[in-house]
Amino acid sequence: IRLAQLNNNKNNEWVLEKFFAHTIEGLPENASVLEHPDKIGDELKIALQKSKIETTNAAIAIPVTSAIIRVVTAPLMTDEELGKAIDTDSLWENLVQLTDNLNDYSIFHQVINRDKERNTMDILFVASKLSDINGYTSIIKKGGLNAVIIDVKCFALKSAVDQMNQIKGSIEESNLTAVLEFGLDENYVMILYENNPIITDIFIRSQDRNTLLKSDNQEEMEGLVRRYMTQVKQAIQDFETKYEKRIRNLKVVSNLPNVDSYLGSFRKNLANTGFNLFDPISEVKVPAQLSEGLKLANRSYLSTVIGLAF
């Protein structure tokens, strides 16, 4: 469990007021949060007491695996026409073939591109299972918090990246930033282009997870990297072809202890492209009492909680 509280000071600088990480013990390996609501709720209560965070309003992130995220192409429409098509439920049924009932999902959409020449438009479609959302909010409530914002994890990451770009004043990166989440649970490329997120899932097999977790077998690691990079390369090429923009660097977010050894392999597989760990607090003021605990070689996995706190 990670808790963070950020505030703006008089100089309009972001300050990390509170930060606390709490390790949960006694759960089986590969256990999910929703399978152990009482245990997680109790642990959250303990974490809150130790963190000394006083506000009860919280922003929480649900895993990308709990959501369906797709960029779909539709005939060109005005916002009014799009609204009518959504109201009748016909649009999503035609564009997104879901096996479940649409009423079981909370749906968010955003038009990310209109192409008048081809008479088409690209829409970001995000559907989160209501049962999962209710499960997470009840755990948060049990822990003593009120979930006022519920975001899919990748959008919390987007918030962290956007803020870092804004603080740095990097106009180029504000217009185009590519992010790669790489780990045991979440794997996707997210390209932020003119503030629109274009997300592509990266598939890894169950045996690949074992390789990431335990393996020191060079052959297995190289095979995993090849398969992984083929998908990353494809996602980048698809974007570059469509938008005629070049991606030179990817900010990497990962919770893997040995992520550095993989980054070296990524660079060899995708020459002329940089892979660097993202630091979500590089431009944030960190008080002395917190700085020691945050001197980490890899701070990228703090991106979600920091992005939520902004």
Protein language model regions, located:
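Early-domain small/polar-rich strand-loop-helix modules and first-structured segments
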Residues: 1-68, 150, 278
